[in-house]
Amino acid sequence: MENNSEKKIVCLINPLAANKRWKRRRKLRAELVKTLPGSCLDTPRTKEETVEMTRSICPSADLVVAVGGDGTIADVLQGIFESGRQDRVVFGVIPFGSGNAFRKSLGIPRNPFKAIKYILEGDIFTIDLLQIEDRVAAFASVGSTAAVTGEKLRHSIPGLFGHLLAARKLLFYKRTENILELSGAVDQEGRQYDQLTINSSFLDCVIGNSNYFGYSWLVAPQARLDDGFLDIILFEMPPLIYIFLFPFIYFGWMQRKLRHFKAKEVVIRGQGLEVQYNGEYLGSMDRVHIKVIPAAIRITGNRKKADRFLVNRADRADSRSKV
């Protein structure tokens, strides 16, 4: 974008993010109002209202900024796509939630005051997203991590402590036989398939375009933000072994030894599959449909730090543009 003063920037702030710390962080609001030309709006309490607010402001916005965690990001992205303006609006992220996984793949610092710099001066580059049923997201999972997300939601336990407490559900998670139907698939040996069917009694199936998950967990080290594929990782082990290996899983070391696929689209069939996207619980279902949205949206970030998660590393023409 040529000139900040000539462009309409809208910040959508989740005041309930990060255990309502927003109420104690008036300084951040003052900095946003001072630094970013345009509007700073608090999002409503419900997801549906946040999506609707985003949809309503998109026709007059050039840059839409989500201030919150991964759930807020998912809601704002949903609103942008429902407005039909995803090819015209630039998306920005200022992390201020319990889970801020998405920002890490983009090279955006966790400190919200430092993140403001990348809204104004950051690189602009194009990334893929995924569509899970009728929702837009950067990552999703089917199985035990989704069950933990649902448990946390049911008991309204905030923050990291809530995740750790809800994680006890992992110990009792029962694996069942599931079928994955992949379209436009590539296996870990590089073999390509128009259609590929996989049987798996996975504990967890992670599907993503971005690399991080939850609390800076490098769950998908081989995913690329702009390769036009979903990254699919199968954790096919009992819960106790998963917990024992979790330090290696957290840093992405174990994933290269697991079954791993890329695909344009996947349908997962099973009984009572628990599903989450961007840390939001979608529910329990017997069939889940996920597909990649290639070149989905332009986003502001730190291209230098994000480079290892990008395919188009040599092409800087797009990223040289400043907001």
Features from the language model and the residues they span:
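ATP/NTP phosphate-donor binding region
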Residues: 1-67, 74, 79, 306, ...
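Short glycine-rich anion-binding loops that position phosphate/pyrophosphate groups of nucleotides
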Residues: 69-72, 96-99, 142-145, 210-211, ...
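Short acidic/glycine-rich loop or secondary-structure boundary segments that cap or lie
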Residues: 146-148, 189-191, 212-216, 240-243
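Glycine-rich phosphate/pyrophosphate-binding beta-alpha loops
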Residues: 141, 145, 206-219, 281
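Short glycine-/acidic-enriched loop or helix-start segments at secondary-structure transitions
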Residues: 22, 75-77, 103-105, 149, ...
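ATP/nucleoside-binding phosphotransfer catalytic cores, i.e., glycine-rich phosphate-binding loops
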Residues: 193, 199, 224-230, 234-323
